[in-house]
Swiss-Prot record:
Assembly: Forms polymers through the coiled coil domains. Interacts with PBP1, MreC and EzrA.
Phylogenetic lineage: Bacteria, Bacillati, Bacillota, Bacilli, Bacillales
GN (gene name): gpsB
GO cellular component: cytoplasm
Described purpose of this protein according to its UniProt entry: Divisome component that associates with the complex late in its assembly, after the Z-ring is formed, and is dependent on DivIC and PBP2B for its recruitment to the divisome. Together with EzrA, is a key component of the system that regulates PBP1 localization during cell cycle progression. Its main role could be the removal of PBP1 from the cell pole after pole maturation is completed. Also contributes to the recruitment of PBP1 to the division complex. Not essential for septum formation.
InterPro entries: Cell_cycle_GpsB (IPR011229), DivIVA_domain (IPR019933), DivIVA_fam (IPR007793)
Chain coiled-coil ranges: 34-71
Similarity-based family: Belongs to the GpsB family.
Domain of life from the UniProt record: Bacteria
Keywords in alphabetical order: Cell cycle, Cell division, Cell shape, Coiled coil, Cytoplasm
Protein's UniProt name: Cell cycle protein GpsB
Pfam families membership: DivIVA
Organism of origin: Bacillus pumilus (strain SAFR-032)
Length: 101
């Protein structure tokens, strides 16, 4: 996924060799700069992996919450029905058949 978008890897940057010209860049300066770029790439890759794992974890949590939400109303309706039935039975017992005559 990410490999399709990124053109260079840390290893490719490390192994890249530049041709030297008559008045080329200082090789030491280029090497130091490339070392910094490599460290940044490695840091970014670690952060991306961490965020992908976190994203996967949160996606699973969301799926579980949605599934639980789908099941919850069915349990609630059954519970409400049971409570109403018990209340009706208690009223019959306490007040007798006077309410239902």
């Amino acid at each position: 996924m990410l490999a399709d978008k990124v053109k260079l890897s840390a290893k490719e940057i490390l192994e890249k060799e530049f041709k030297t010209g008559v008045r080329g860049y200082k090789q030491e300066e280029v090497d130091k700069f490339l070392d910094m770029v490599i460290k940044d790439y490695e840091t970014f890759n670690q952060e991306i992996e961490k965020l992908q794992q976190e994203n996967l974890h949160l996606s699973k949590q969301l799926e579980e919450a949605v599934e639980q939400g789908k099941r919850q109303p069915a349990q609630s309706n059954t519970t409400n029905f049971d409570i109403l039935k018990r209340l009706s039975n208690l009223e019959k017992h306490v007040f007798g058949s006077k309410l239902y005559d």
